[in-house]
């Protein structure tokens, strides 16, 4: 049985993504064969591709997908052929039509959650959960800054923060994205290319700044976050969309008001299969209750992954994106 797999032989731009027909064997003990119905696109995929997060080559790409089980290996008792499942890692290689994958890295997808929502929202939803509830521990009435508030994680952050009672200030790059952030619940939206973000934040908060800044943009917004965050406030740097922040002078944190900084990663908060299973169930419940909703702004053919990477890195996307294997409706 031949399946289509994306792979990279070297790091670089989107053009390094190659496609190959690879024979798929029967699942090994502890594995299942999962056929993808939708694959999630995440910024971490670009970091693996461009070498910011090094991996041994050659390697696959992609961490997040949803689909159905086609075969079950020996020793697997939790899953059956036909089950609807999703995964968000830690195994990389989701850019494919089907693959054999460890059974304990899968989560059941409820019947009322579409495969596209599961593929687009599981990793981002779990990221949002740990950022808000366990890393920053956001409290009601806090003022919170969300950079890239119309992005995949950004929109979920806005909704989750409103759910816990925070006042949300979002930054975006266009008027179209500003409207999307407001529709998600943002109390105020700032166009960071046209307005002084830190000054606007200070004005909106009576001069004090925000208790928490969620910054997934990185290099371009780091100084904004430093200046917009309140005394003894927290900057949560969870991504590098514009490039990594480096050479940080710790004395600056004192000068800006004894600030705290965290650089968390998903798999330190979802460290084992039990934690990942509990988190997935919680996030699916939040979708089911309507606390958070997915905005899937782009759908690409699976083999157009390179173009999807170009659009994501150029900030042309809105909300989340999915890659759809050929023949899937």
Across the structure, where does each feature detected by a protein language model lie?
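Short, glycine/polar-rich helix-capping loops at beta-to-alpha or helix-loop-helix junctions
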Residues: 94-96, 173-180, 245-250
